Amino acid sequence: MQAYFDQLDRVRYEGPQSTNPLAFRHYNPDELVLGKRMEDHLRFAACYWHTFCWNGADMFGVGAFNRPWQQPGEALELAKRKADVAFEFLHKLNVPFYCFHDVDVSPEGASLKEYKNNFAQMVDVLAAKQEQSGVKLLWGTANCFTNPRYGAGAATNPDPEVFSWAATQVVTAMNATHKLGGENYVLWGGREGYETLLNTDLRQEREQIGRFMQMVVEHKHKMGFQGTLLIEPKPQEPTKHQYDYDVATVYGFLKQFGLEKEIKVNIEANHATLAGHSFHHEIATAIALGIFGSVDANRGDAQLGWDTDQFPISVEENALVMYEILKAGGFTTGGLNFDAKVRRQSTDKYDLFYGHIGAMDTMALSLKIAARMVEDGELDKRVAKRYAGWNGELGQQILKGQLSLGELAQYAEQHNLAPVHQSGHQELLENLVNRYLFDK
């Protein structure tokens, strides 16, 4: 079959001085960073949905891309053509992983039977492509938000039959992910929220989605899936309010239903923006709570109130993100999936490469800067010094529960405590970070 990207052999590392737009300047897969290959640190993935499924349509205009596999035709044959192009792209981009929703790779069909038959055929196609290319599945998921049946949600739907249909999709997608060797399974509640409280029973819906997640965990263990289950937080869009608002909200939900040891989070940068947080905040919070799993690397626009899903280009932002990840020991089953799309005006098929190459270079340079920060250890030393009192006798007695509130008040009076505020040195630390970012 003729190559779709016929003007490109493969994207390769050419170094920081290169002006070739189809080459990496900073991402060198085999370069050692803190004793580990860069590819193994970053675990890059390209997503099926934005890259191969979106046709360029938006709220105000029809599709603009004219991809060959998006033309009228027999649905399964078009899905196979899309898979051909997808794996050509993945190979030429030199990414080790990809991610998909069920209906990204397979026609949904008109019934559950058609859905399952179509998906089964496409799983066989994908398995053959993976074997041929060496590309692996980072994670799979089920799209339980696009079809009109999910207008009022999937697991939170007022109709238990819709809940059951969603369960069928999730079981099928989990089984497919397992068969394809996927390292994670993601649950994003696209419409698990509400438009108005006037017709919403919050307690009922919370109980429903809690039970749904418990069943997902039960099925994971029953099928022997060794990967990680991930919830992807998002505060709103398409609903007014979504129940997986941010990392902290998800943790509270997991604790309520006894799932905090079973499910981690897949954090998207743009979703952090929509929640009023920095990407750094969400990563650090997940690590602090012990539920960090994987990352959807992209960026939003702070001046817009919706998910723009642009490619990450800020080394300043992502160096701090990679710093947190490195300090926590790096990815295990997770990775950096580019949940990002070219702009509607970017109609050249090679724009797909330009977007991903820039993003991969951004994250690679961020990794190298973060590694310098870890090796230098200056930030850690200053934070440790700031909290040093908690390693002393008084601090340890408080943390170990050896003093009651009343005893602590008595201690303060007996010792005539008169603590004086110590500077947080924020400006000094910001200058220190800039040294790592901009000094050669």
Curated annotation (Swiss-Prot):
The record's subcellular location field reads: Cytoplasm
Chain positions recorded as Mg(2+) 1 binding sites = E232, E268, D296, D339
Q: Which residues form a coiled coil?
A: none
Q: Catalytic residues?
A: H101, D104
Its cofactor is:
Mg(2+)
Q: Which GO terms describe its cellular component?
A: cytoplasm
SUPFAM superfamilies in the record: Xylose isomerase-like
- Binding annotation for Mg(2+) 2: E268, H271, D307, D309
What does the UniProt cofactor note say? Answer: Binds 2 magnesium ions per subunit.
- Which reactions does this protein catalyse? alpha-D-xylose = alpha-D-xylulofuranose
EC number(s)?
5.3.1.5
Top enzyme category? isomerase
Q: InterPro entries under this entry?
A: Xyl_isomerase-like_sf, Xylose_isom_bac, Xylose_isomerase
An example GO biological process term is:
D-xylose metabolic process
Record key words, sorted = Carbohydrate metabolism, Cytoplasm, Isomerase, Magnesium, Metal-binding, Xylose metabolism
Gene Ontology MF, one: magnesium ion binding
Q: Which domain of life is it from?
A: Bacteria
Q: What is its main location?
A: cytoplasm
Cite the HAMAP family for this sequence: Xylose_isom_A (MF_00455)
Q: Describe the family membership recorded for this protein in Swiss-Prot or TrEMBL.
A: Belongs to the xylose isomerase family.
Q: How does it assemble?
A: Homotetramer.
Q: What is this protein called?
A: Xylose isomerase
What organism does this protein naturally occur in? Answer: Salmonella paratyphi B (strain ATCC BAA-1250 / SPB7)
The gene coding this protein: xylA
